[in-house]
């Protein structure tokens, strides 16, 4: 039971019945789930499970039944309770066999126009099939923090206590180096 809260240990997999369920989802509507951004920032892997669905994170049109989440914390053990929010469900209307995504795509020309009105980035943006981003390893001076690495041994993170923790308790700063390069440990979270 998650009533009083439960600790989900890192490197373990849990399947939890969700409070939400669906009752006669119209056949013209399907749903797709994804982790909330805060879940990803904590390196917690989540997937939605619907009975008789052929894939994770999908709910077919016409579905009625319970929903479950597979939860696997990778870098930090987390505390959750009834009502904690780790995943989100997005509904899509199906039209003549084709899915109509809710949302829109902005063209490169529109992105350039937007940048002229309200700058999207400092300096000149790289716009090619969308706005391109890259990481900055050089820093403006040697020793400047350019990123963070998750600490291997930390206290538990209560996912419902937003902005309640000190960065230094969970993350180790990565300083810029004069060589302007960085070797990452593939078993760590950055």
Where in the sequence are the language-model features?
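DUTPase catalytic domain/fold
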Residues: 1-190
């Amino acid at each position: 039971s998650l009533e009083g809260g439960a600790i989900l240990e890192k490197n373990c997999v849990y399947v939890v019945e969700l409070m939400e369920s669906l009752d006669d989802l119209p056949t013209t509507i399907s749903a797709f789930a994804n982790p909330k951004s805060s879940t990803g920032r904590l390196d917690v892997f989540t997937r939605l499970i619907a009975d008789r669905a052929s894939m994770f994170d999908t709910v077919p049109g016409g579905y009625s039944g319970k929903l479950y989440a597979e939860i696997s914390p990778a870098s930090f053990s987390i505390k959750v309770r009834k009502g904690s929010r780790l995943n989100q469900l997005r509904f899509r209307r199906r039209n003549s066999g084709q899915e109509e995504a809710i949302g829109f795509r902005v063209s490169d020309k529109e992105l350039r126009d937007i940048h002229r009105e309200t700058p999207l980035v400092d300096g000149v943006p790289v716009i090619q099939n969308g706005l391109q981003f890259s990481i900055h390893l050089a820093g403006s001076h040697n020793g400047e923090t350019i990123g963070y690495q998750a600490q291997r041994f930390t206290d538990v993170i209560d996912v419902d206590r937003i902005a309640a923790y000190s960065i230094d308790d969970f993350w180790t700063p990565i300083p810029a180096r004069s060589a302007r390069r960085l070797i990452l440990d593939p078993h760590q979270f950055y």
